[in-house]
């Protein structure tokens, strides 16, 4: 057997209370009290309401000692502190806030305070993660071992030391963890889109088998193809050189287009490096021969590049001169 209903649900009014109903309830209690029996109270007060609804309306809204209006910052602080200590025991929390009801505090928590707390926690976490990277040289702090993202920062070691070429190990040492290709590019330039990640023929998107491109890098790409592919699962020599060159070209903080040859043309220095002659620093600094190689069109000679592709890797796709990045447009 269950508890008998306090009233006939079909004969009572539901929904928000009207000002007239509030006035009737308040006037009757001020004159006669509730009589200790809320079940018979609605009939005596002339209300078509359930006895439970009358009781809650009085206790939570109409009592003369109830505070209405916005919560103060001090009340917010008390609620935060008590919630952290005892959880959602609203009646106990209400005992520490004179004039506030447990129902009022619960509703305030669910509608405003919880969102405020989550927002504050999120901002604090972001600040805590970013603070060690604001000045990596001057601050002696322990950096996280495996953060999910590389925080952006105004500090850039490449701009301060143009002779220090960017490498994975360099960026990893700055940030205190092993960085992948995508993370390195995001760290160098957060504006690079993340949706143009070209991988090898096996669609392996690991940081060893692909490279992230900016839409602005290859405006003249007609079909997005992989820079190179693996041969029997082993990265080819030309693939590693392509990635190394592209990494150097992505770091444009200390590169002068007019003297370094980064104007979208395939220079003799690039060709020599692909062909196994010269080193990368010589190619980047422009100390070697910088004459342009004609890659096509009238009077063009593409045999040197064709021979290079055959000699280096039959499965590799060479980077054509049309697709070199235009950083300085």
From Swiss-Prot:
Changing residue 170 to F: In strain: cv. Cvi-0 and cv. Cvi-1. One of its GO terms (molecular function) is DNA-binding transcription factor activity. Residues 122-162 are annotated as: Disordered. InterPro entries: Homeodomain-like_sf, Myb_dom, SANT/Myb. It comes from the Eukaryota. It holds the Pfam family Myb_DNA-binding. Mostly expressed in roots. Also present in shoot tips and flower buds. It is found in: Nucleus. Residues 38-62, 90-113 bind DNA. Residues 122-131, 144-154 have a biased composition (Low complexity). PANTHER family: OS09G0431300 PROTEIN, TRANSCRIPTION FACTOR RAX1. This is Transcription factor RAX1.
């Amino acid at each position: 057997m269950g508890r008998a209903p306090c009233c006939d649900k079909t004969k009572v009014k539901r929904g928000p209370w009207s000002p007239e109903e509030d006035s009737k309830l308040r006037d009757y209690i001020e004159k006669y009290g509730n009589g200790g029996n809320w079940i018979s109270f609605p009939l005596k007060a002339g209300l078509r309401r359930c006895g439970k609804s009358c009781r809650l309306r009085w206790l939570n809204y109409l009592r003369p000692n109830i505070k209405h209006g916005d919560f103060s910052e001090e009340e917010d602080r008390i609620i935060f502190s008590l919630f952290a200590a005892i959880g959602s025991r609203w009646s106990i929390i209400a005992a520490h806030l004179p004039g506030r009801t447990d129902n009022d505090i619960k509703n305030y928590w669910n509608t405003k305070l919880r969102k405020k707390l989550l927002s504050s926690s999120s901002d604090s976490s972001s600040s805590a993660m970013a603070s060690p990277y604001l000045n990596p040289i001057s601050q002696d702090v322990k950096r996280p071992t495996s953060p999910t993202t590389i925080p952006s920062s105004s500090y850039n070691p490449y701009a301060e030391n143009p002779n220090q070429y960017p490498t994975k190990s360099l960026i990893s040492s700055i940030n205190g963890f092993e960085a992948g290709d995508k993370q390195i590019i995001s760290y160098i330039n957060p504006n690079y889109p993340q949706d143009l990640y070209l991988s090898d023929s096996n669609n392996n998107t690991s940081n060893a088998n692909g490279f992230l491109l900016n839409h602005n890098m290859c405006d003249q790409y007609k079909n997005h193809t992989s820079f190179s592919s693996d041969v029997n699962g082993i990265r080819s020599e030309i693939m590693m050189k392509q990635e190394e060159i592209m990494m150097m070209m992505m770091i444009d903080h200390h590169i002068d287009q007019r003297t370094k040859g980064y104007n979208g043309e395939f220079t003799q220095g690039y060709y020599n490096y692909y062909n196994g002659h010269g080193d990368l620093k010589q190619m980047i600094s422009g100390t070697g021969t910088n004459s342009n190689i004609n890659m096509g069109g009238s009077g063009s000679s593409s045999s040197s590049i064709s021979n290079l592709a055959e000699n280096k890797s039959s499965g590799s796709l060479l980077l054509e001169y049309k697709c070199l990045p235009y950083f300085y447009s």
